Amino acid sequence: MGATARSLRLALGLLLLGTLPRGADACSCSPVHPQQAFCNADVVIRAKAVSEKEVDSGNDIYGNPIKRIQYEIKQIKMFKGPEKDIEFIYTAPSSAVCGVSLDVGGKKEYLIAGKAEGDGKMHITLCDFIVPWDTLSTTQKKSLNHRYQMGCECKITRCPMIPCYISSPDECLWMDWVTEKSINGHQAKFFACIKRSDGSCAWYRGAAPPKQEFLDIEDP
């Protein structure tokens, strides 16, 4: 093979390499309804971040230190989790690897859902449900106390486009993306998927506890 041909193949190879997706440089998450985020999480708290620092968290398979961001927090209320208050939250150092950035100083309150690490610690990623507390609707805030838990045996199925259907009675169809082009639409803000007496699940709207008539009804 001549030098010109080798150069062309090398240039083509570099061009193709440059067009490949760089999965390691991006964080991708599937949208979930706030109730799903609650049910999937080990810990759900209302808290403020007091301080942050970078810490070592062991080594990778090559012996290189693994860095994480440690947030010292002030827990205001625990909606789900261990008996011991959460004192520290850990996350990756960059959003490219799903790390979360919280405002520190103790002024901004968050709803934080994530995975327990034991001994007053938890881990969070961009795929967890972490939002400023004051952006939640009244219904969402009240649902954190009991309502969301009532539907953790239900399945919320996101509808990406019409037509879409449920495949079993214990599903609720989440339509926000179709109707509002947003995952933070009406159903996310004002509805919870509740399991009823007959084992089926249905959307329930409002901040008040579901009445017995709703739980006993056979059809949505």
From Swiss-Prot:
Chief site of localization: secreted
CDD domains: NTR_TIMP
Site, as annotated: Involved in metalloproteinase-binding: 40, 61, 67
Database matches in InterPro entries: Netrin_domain (IPR001134), TIMP (IPR001820), TIMP-like_OB-fold (IPR008993), TIMP_C (IPR027465), TIMP_CS (IPR030490)
GO molecular function terms noted in the UniProt entry: metalloendopeptidase inhibitor activity; protease binding; zinc ion binding
Residues noted as binding Zn(2+) in the record, renumbered to the chain: 27
Involved in metalloproteinase-binding: annotated span: 27-30, 95-96
Reported modifications of this chain: The activity of TIMP2 is dependent on the presence of disulfide bonds.
Function summary: Complexes with metalloproteinases (such as collagenases) and irreversibly inactivates them by binding to their catalytic zinc cofactor.
Subunit structure: Interacts (via the C-terminal) with MMP2 (via the C-terminal PEX domain); the interaction inhibits the MMP2 activity.
Entry-linked PANTHER family: METALLOPROTEASE INHIBITOR, METALLOPROTEINASE INHIBITOR 2
Family: Belongs to the protease inhibitor I35 (TIMP) family.
Record-given protein name: Metalloproteinase inhibitor 2
